[in-house]
Each structure stands twice: as C-alpha cells, then as structure tokens.
C-alpha cells in the first residue's frame, strides 16, 4: 500500500491547491496634499498569499475561488497569472463585486481589517463551481477561515475537503 500511495503522490499535478478568498487589501500609503490618507490597492486573501509564496519557492500551485467581473477582479486574475498560479478555477461573477478590505496598520505593526463583502464574490462560490479534479490532483489542499463564514461557500469548502480526504490529499487549514 505504501508503494501505491507514493506512486499516487508522484502523479499529482500540483503541490498545493488552495480554495478561498481572493480580494483587494487597501493599505495606507501616506497622505495627500490635503492631509487625507492615501490607500494603495494590493492583491490579498490568505489562501492566495500562501500560493504566491509557494510559487516563489518553485512549487506548482492552483487557486479555486470567485471574484467579481469588475476592475478589481480582473486585476486579481491578472496578478495570479503573472506570479504563475494556475487560475483555471478562478470564477468571475458578473452580479457580485470583488471583496474589498481596508487595512489599518498600528504603530506596533499589528493590523486591523474592515471587510466590504455584503456579499462579496468570494462568499458566493458554490460546490458545483469547484473543479474537483484540481482537488484530487494535488499533494496538499489548503483553505482558510473566510471560506467558512457564509453557508454557501462553507458547503462548497466542506465538499472540497471531503473530496481531498477521500483521495488521500493532505488538508491544510489556516485559522488566520
């Protein structure tokens, strides 16, 4: 059996597949001439941040999630493509906007997040939209807490976790 599992492991297409939020973090970036805070739009979302770092380390990764078919969603899609993350299961929703987060950084480096997702596209991912072949063909399946905050995406996430486990895929959870 160990030989079979090791062979199966070798044949996996991806090192890590992550499911969850892909959003825009607006981070403080100085003051305007009028003294108002300036904010910079940065790609964010813990599951995809993990994938981006793994890509830099030479790992093969893929993302499963949903963004709005809007300026920010397209920016996020372009960004994951540029860093080499497989985005074949990134879904663009024409009815719901991409989730936004305002990030306040305190003097000690700690951060506070205010999410604008009422709902956000990431919350609307459905089980039938998940390419389970990605879940089956990875060594590690990773997900985070935000994909557990709304019933629809929670059910989709649970289905992906169960599929991963049934295929002997290691499941990783970020309680972030």
Where do the protein language model's features map onto the residues?
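Ribokinase/PfkB-type carbohydrate-kinase core domain
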Residues: 10-18, 81, 107-176
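A short, structured active-site edge motif that brings together acidic residues
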Residues: 89-98
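Glycine-rich phosphate/adenosyl-contacting loop at the front of the ribokinase-like
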Residues: 9-86
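Acidic, glycine-rich active-site loops and adjacent beta-strand->loop/helix elements
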Residues: 66-72, 96, 119-121
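Short beta-strand scaffold segments in enzyme catalytic cores
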Residues: 100-104
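N-terminal amphipathic/basic-hydrophobic helices that include classical n-h-c signal peptides
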Residues: 1-11
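Solvent-exposed alpha-helices and their adjacent loops that cap or buttress functional pockets
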Residues: 31, 94-95, 105-107, 133-135
